[in-house]
Design a protein with these regions (language model features):
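Membrane-proximal interfacial segments on either side of biological membranes
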Residues: 1-208
Length: 208
């Protein structure tokens, strides 16, 4: 535990070969602050020093929040290095009323001097009505669903998102759905108001 804060941490470190297993508990912390890689960390990853087969890293960061302006109330962010490959597998974001979002089959890599994350995002909806209430979805568009699977590439340099595949309740979505979801592509302009509007537009064409 840090004496100057409420941060708890524990772990094990081996030097030769380098192997770090670290669990960090931040306690009360704004979730979206954790999701923004700062410039120094981005540049460090881009150096390629972490893409080393002699490195083994398993870091878990836990946080929760009661702030009303946050979509998620708790999170566990996992950062792993295995055989020179970086991933964020099993990172999870939880909304206590609506459900959760989980990363799987992820790969963090450098391509053309850009830091790219390719990942599956698994969305598990616990309560559709709570989701519709949060989004202010019109009654005629409230077609219930239990899960969604999205595969995407995220460019940390340009903040651009490329959607590769989307399934809802294990069914492929329409081309019209894919065209609309592509409006999320520029993450620089994404905000809660825009996200609500676009998601409701998607729900209006989803037939269930």
């Amino acid at each position: 535990r840090s004496n100057s804060s409420k941060i708890d941490y524990r772990g094990e470190l081996s030097i030769n070969p380098f192997d770090l297993d670290l669990d960090i508990n931040l306690g009360e912390y704004k979730i979206f602050q954790l999701l923004n890689l700062n410039a120094i960390l981005k540049e460090f990853i881009k150096t390629g020093l972490l893409f080393n087969e002699n490195l083994s890293l398993d870091v878990s960061i836990n946080a929760k929040t009661k702030a009303i302006d946050q979509i998620f109330q708790s999170t566990q962010i996992n950062f792993n290095i295995v055989n020179g490959k970086l991933n964020l597998n099993d990172t999870i974001l939880i909304n206590d009323k609506i459900g959760l979002l989980k990363l799987a089959n992820s790969n963090l890599f450098v391509e053309n001097n850009r830091l790219i994350l390719n990942t599956d995002i698994l969305i598990d909806v616990k309560d559709s009505m709570s989701l519709f209430s949060f989004l202010n979805t019109s009654k005629k568009s409230r077609n219930k669903f239990k899960s969604a699977l999205i595969n995407l590439d995220y460019d940390f340099l340009t903040n651009q998102i490329e959607f590769n595949n989307v399934k809802i309740d294990n069914k492929e979505v329409s081309d019209q759905f894919l065209n609309i979801i592509d409006d999320f592509k520029d993450n620089n302009s994404n905000n809660l108001i825009k996200s609500r509007r676009l998601i409701n537009k998607l729900l209006s064409i989803y037939e269930g």
